Amino acid sequence: MLIDFHTHAFPEKIASRAVGKLSYEGGGLMPQTDGSAVSLKEQMKQDGVDISVVLGIATNPRQQHSVNDFAMALNRDPAFVAFGSVHPDAPDALEELERIHAAGLKGVKFHPEYQHFYANDEKMKPIYRKISQLGLITLFHAGHDYGFPPPYHAMPEHLLRA
């Protein structure tokens, strides 16, 4: 069984815009799909991938519910294992983690550059504690990112102190 642990898919209405933005910010990395779940499944078939872990990001506090609703819908397809996302500044981040867990999502993805926080920020402690209590996987987009200038928010030293 071949599992691709880092893929992205977006709702149809924003897929092309999201892929365009990621392409522009990606330092020359070209997307292999049009951003839709249908296109991702086609690419999986071409590449012999059985399961894709789909990672979405709530880039602002208002997005976390819609990002997670999409992840929950994707999870109905056995070809996908979607992770949820919470935004560190969302007032209901802890409650959203409960919803992610109750829906059967396996983990939570953070992208400190897009979400504007350091991995070792104090404000993250209650979120990390709740993730641990719920037994969810925590995944960071870490290190250098082509789309963002320094300083980087999830370098190894930040993760070690998180």
Residue ranges and their predicted role:
Residues 1-125, 130:
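Mid-domain alpha/beta scaffold segments of enzyme catalytic cores
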Residues 106-107, 120-162:
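Catalytic pocket-lining loop regions of alpha/beta-barrel enzymes
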